Amino acid sequence: MLPFSRIAIIGLGLIGSSLAHAIRAYLPTARVTGHDADPDVRAIARRIDLCDDITDTAGAAVIDADLVVLCVPPGAMAAVAAAIAPDLAADVILSETASCQVSIIAAIRAVLPDVTLVPAHPVAGTENSGPESGFATLFQNRWCILTPPAGTEPLAVARVEDLWKKVGANVETMDAAHHDLVLAVTSHLPHIIAYTIVGTASDLENVTQGEVIKYSAGGFRDFTRIAASDPTMWRDVFLANKDAVLQMLQRFTEDLTQLQRAIRWDDGDALFEHFSKTRAIRRSIIEQGQDDAAPDFGRHRE
């Protein structure tokens, strides 16, 4: 398998900075060039020696790169793709890490119709953001889902798959539309629920914010961790994947109504059955190594 020799990462938040750390740790022969639209982020990236090179423009970052990875919010993907178009090498492989794929693939294809595109979404993260939040082991034993459009060159897909395996990820290939539906269930819906619960608690008129903070139980604290995620990225995710998110919200609303009815009518059997089923799912997640009781899924920063 021909390894990538020059990798450009556009967007140096949690995912982009972690990918830079991981490539430099596990693929030391590859040269990593990074860019971020925010000059303060670029300054931090230079200070912490995040990449071999940090450029002031996206176009400069991708010159001579054989792999370009877009790690920007979904709403910025099309503009960034257009900005780098004149400087891309003819044989470059373009990838992106968005958690919603159908609309992003279409947006990129609109400005780069002929580029070899291999999207790769790492299902990994923390509530932190920014270039100093990244660490090389973020992707260890996490899934990375590839969603190559139909007709993508198999060798290009294999090379991107190989890169993600080398930085520690488990790799799966999936249809983009199915990916978006799965992630609406496992990621997008939990985030919108967390934002809503924390927002409701902060808006209660007969309970002060001070009391909410002082007496927060473990479950509420878990929701606040999720609700601390990057608001720009999540705004873009919900808008970009709105059809799947709305579908899952409708299903969730129906299920919530059933629970409300069970509580109202003292139907303890229905509640117990539901809670037992969901408890089993939690145990399965831990058994498959997709969670850990320790912070950051038990991973240590490197």
Residues covered by each model-derived region:
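Rossmann-like NAD(P)(H) cofactor-binding subdomain of soluble oxidoreductases
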Residues: 80-132
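Interdomain hinge/lid region at the active-site interface
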Residues: 209-277
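Rossmann-like NAD(P)-binding element
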Residues: 58-88, 92-95
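Residues at the starts of beta-strands that form the adenosine-phosphate
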Residues: 6, 31, 116, 143, ...
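Short acidic-hydrophobic, aromatic-tinged amphipathic segments that line or gate anion-handling sites
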Residues: 53-57, 173
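NAD(P)+-binding Rossmann beta1-loop-alpha1 motif at the extreme N-terminus of oxidoreductases
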Residues: 1-54, 62-64
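Internal alpha-helical scaffold of NAD(P)-dependent oxidoreductase catalytic cores
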Residues: 138-225
